[in-house]
Swiss-Prot record:
Subcellular location as annotated: Cytoplasm; Nucleus
Ribosomal protein listed as a keyword: no
Gene Ontology terms, MF aspect: transcription coactivator activity; transcription corepressor activity
Family per record: Belongs to the CBF-beta family.
Protein name (record): Core-binding factor subunit beta homolog bro-1
Length: 152
């Protein structure tokens, strides 16, 4: 079974969740909800230092462990862009800003347009690049998601 759709653009425009998440929406750092706020702030900072940002999209209830490609801190505001990931069969990036004090922010999805190029192995044969790429999770993270019941 393929992980990605063949028509990324139309799939992005017609997917129920992606049409909502393509606009800025409220997101929260929801890990360690029962811990004291100071501990949650510190854990949030540690995740950002590791180029990770586990997000919960409040409107849809979707939880995503995002790997960061880029982040910049300006006071309490952390602006970021994620590495590409596959969401509902579509390559996307997560872009937004989170507040390190309130642990809330405004975040949106953007369709990621992968470069397609051909590899020339010899003069006579041209092989297209492989469509599937790793989703950016470690074996331990994949095992944890499987234990939680996600069929991947």
């Amino acid at each position: 079974m393929k992980r990605t759709t063949t028509d990324q653009q139309s799939s992005f425009q017609t997917d129920y969740f992606l049409t909502q998440l393509s606009h800025f929406t409220e997101a929260k750092f929801s890990l360690f909800e029962h811990a004291p706020l100071s501990e949650r702030r510190e854990r949030f900072r540690v995740h950002v230092e590791r180029d990770e940002m586990p997000l919960t999209f409040c409107k849809t209830g979707i939880n995503i462990p995002v790997k960061l490609e880029w982040s910049q801190t300006n006071g309490n505001e952390i602006s970021f862009r994620s590495r590409p990931l596959v969401f509902n069969g579509i390559w996307v990036k997560v872009i937004g800003a989170m507040n390190s004090e309130s642990l809330e922010g405004r975040v949106r999805f953007e369709r990621f347009q992968r470069e397609k190029r051909d590899r020339v192995i010899s003069e006579t044969f041209v092989f297209p690049e492989v469509e599937e790429e790793p989703i950016g999770l470690t074996d331990a993270e994949i095992a944890a998601l499987r234990r939680d019941g996600l069929p991947i």
